[in-house]
A protein has these predicted regions:
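Terminal-region recognition feature
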Residues: 1-167, 173, 178-180, 184-204, ...
Length: 274
C-alpha cells in the first residue's frame, strides 16, 4: 500500500518503514557469509553487549554523500556503522559497531562523522566508550574525505584519554586506520582465531619484503596477546569477548570525576584487621 506522507498516519508509517530499512540495511548474502564464519552482525553485537532493551540508536538514517565511482547508486542507511547509547549493568555507555557487511566495514566521511559524534557524546555525558571494530580501513572511493575523518577520530581518542574509559573489541579483520584508533584506547579485546589487527595485509608485506606471512602470524589475536602485547584479553569467541567487557566495566569508574563502583561483600571473610 502506498504511504501518503502528507498525513500524520502516513508520516508515522514512513518513519517505521525507514527504521526497518535502516535495521536491515545489510545485504542478506553478506549477513549469511558473516554467520557462516560464526560471527554476529554489527547490530547483534551491540544488542548482546548492552542491557536488554536499553539501546537507543543515533543517526541510523545517515547515508554517504559520495558521487565518485558510481557510489551514488548505493547509499544504504547507517553508512556501515551502528552508533548509539545504552546501559551495561544499569550504567550508561556509548557504543559504535562497524558493519563489515556494508562496504566491507570501511570508514567513509559520514561513517567517521558518526563515530566522532558518539565519542563527543561519551565525553560530554561522562560515560565509557566501547568500539566494536571490523573493517578494511579507509573507504578508498571517498579519498581524502575518508582519511580526514580518521584524523578526527584519533584526536578525540587522545583528548578522551584519562577522561572516560575507552574499550575496543576487535571482532574480525581490522586494517589500516581502523587499528590505530583501538591502539589509542585503554583496553583491547580480541577473539581467538577470528580477530586480526594489522597496518596492511599479507599481500602487501609479500610485495614489499618478499616475506610470506599468514593473517594470524601478522596480526592475529594470539600474536597481539602473546607477542606484541597490544591485546589485553584473548577471548574464546564473540560471546566471551562481549561478556568480558561487561565484567570489565564493573571495575571502572564512569569518568575521571567519579570513583569506581563499590559493591557489598556477600561472602563472610576470615580476614581480620590488625
Amino acid at each position: 500500500m502506498e504511504i501518503d506522507i502528507h498525513t500524520t498516519a502516513g508520516k508515522i508509517a514512513d518513519l517505521g518503514r525507514r527504521i526497518d530499512e535502516a535495521v536491515n540495511a545489510a545485504p542478506a548474502a553478506a549477513i549469511d557469509k558473516q554467520r557462516a564464519k560464526g560471527k554476529m552482525t554489527a547490530r547483534e553485537r551491540v544488542l548482546r553487549l548492552l542491557d536488554e532493551g536499553s539501546f537507543t540508536e543515533v543517526d541510523e538514517f545517515a547515508r554517504h554523500r559520495s558521487t565518485n565511482f558510481g557510489m551514488e547508486r548505493n547509499r544504504p542507511y547507517t553508512d556501515g556503522v551502528v552508533t548509539g547509547m545504552g546501559t551495561i549493568h544499569g550504567r550508561p555507555v556509548c557504543v559504535f559497531s562497524q558493519d563489515v557487511t556494508i562496504f566491507g566495514g570501511s570508514l567513509g566521511e559520514v561513517n567517521g562523522e558518526k563515530i566522532c559524534k558518539i565519542i563527543d557524546l561519551a565525553v560530554k555525558t561522562g560515560c565509557p566508550l566501547i568500539g566494536i571494530n571490523e573493517g578494511g580501513g579507509a573507504r578508498i572511493q571517498e579519498g581524502v574525505a575518508s582519511l580526514a575523518r580518521f584524523g578526527d577520530i584519533f584526536k578525540r581518542n587522545t583528548r578522551a584519554s584519562g577522561v572516560i574509559p575507552q574499550i575496543s573489541i576487535i571482532m574480525g579483520a581490522a586494517a589500516g586506520g581502523q587499528v590505530y584508533s583501538p591502539a589509542l584506547t585503554d583496553f583491547i579485546v580480541m577473539v581467538d582465531q577470528s580477530s586480526q589487527m594489522f597496518i596492511t595485509g599479507p599481500a602487501v608485506v609479500k610485495a614489499v619484503t618478499g616475506e610470506d606471512v599468514s593473517l594470524e602470524e601478522l596480526g592475529g589475536a594470539r600474536t597481539h596477546s602473546q607477542v606484541s602485547g597490544n591485546s589485553h584479553y584473548l577471548a574464546a569467541n564473540e560471546d566471551d569477548a562481549l561478556e568480558y567487557v561487561r565484567d570489565l566495566l564493573t571495575y571502572l569508574p564512569q569518568n575521571n570525576l567519579e570513583d569506581p563502583p563499590v559493591y557489598d561483600d556477600d561472602e563472610e571473610s576470615d580476614l581480620t584487621i590488625t
